Amino acid sequence: MDKNYIKAAIEAILFAWSDPISSSELSNILDIKVTETKEIMKEMIDEFNFHKRGIQIIQMNDHYQMSTRAEYHEILQKLFEPKQNKGLTQASLETLAIIAYRQPITKTEIESVRGVKCDKAISTLFEKNLIEDRGRLEKTGRPILFGTTLHFLKNFGLKSLEDLPKITEIDQANEEELIKDIYNQQLKGR
């Protein structure tokens, strides 16, 4: 494999996989030697640092993770400041519907259903206390499992998850419409 292709693949893996990943896991995925992976990771870390990019690759023992640079903390903090009195966006509603019907579920599984990244939606749902961390999945990387909260049930006027409309005859694409309808009904009742 071409070295530039390997670097691009590693960058994609680190971006998609938010948890630290070991050089041996990267090697297995890319079907290259661990020594080659470590050499390429060293080069990539140096390149990211040399160009002072907004993101960096950090190394923790034999694990690697992509993160933002500390000097952009204040800027990023503004992005994640709680937005008061804002409703849920379409993306947040879709993400919430997927979590409600398929919990416990990982971020990767949610993104697989939605077809797009869901970091902002998950952050918003956590901020509004509609979802919570339900532990870790026992597989490589131990991704977080998400589920809905009691606050979710209260806000949507549900006694339990069994009160969610049944989707046996409804296709998966309409899950978010069900949550949106419940959400809109609750807003009208206030």
Swiss-Prot record:
The keyword Phosphoprotein does not apply. The keyword Lyase does not apply. GO terms for biological process: cell division; chromosome separation; DNA replication. Pfam families: SMC_ScpB. Keywords: Cell cycle, Cell division, Chromosome partition, Cytoplasm. It is found in: Cytoplasm. SUPFAM superfamilies: Winged helix' DNA-binding domain. One of its GO terms (cellular component) is cytoplasm. It comes from the Bacteria. Disulfide bonds: none annotated. Homodimer. Homodimerization may be required to stabilize the binding of ScpA to the Smc head domains. Component of a cohesin-like complex composed of ScpA, ScpB and the Smc homodimer, in which ScpA and ScpB bind to the head domain of Smc. The presence of the three proteins is required for the association of the complex with DNA. Participates in chromosomal partition during cell division. May act via the formation of a condensin-like complex containing Smc and ScpA that pull DNA away from mid-cell into both cell halves. Belongs to the ScpB family. HAMAP family: ScpB. This is Segregation and condensation protein B. It comes from Alkaliphilus metalliredigens (strain QYMF). The gene is scpB.
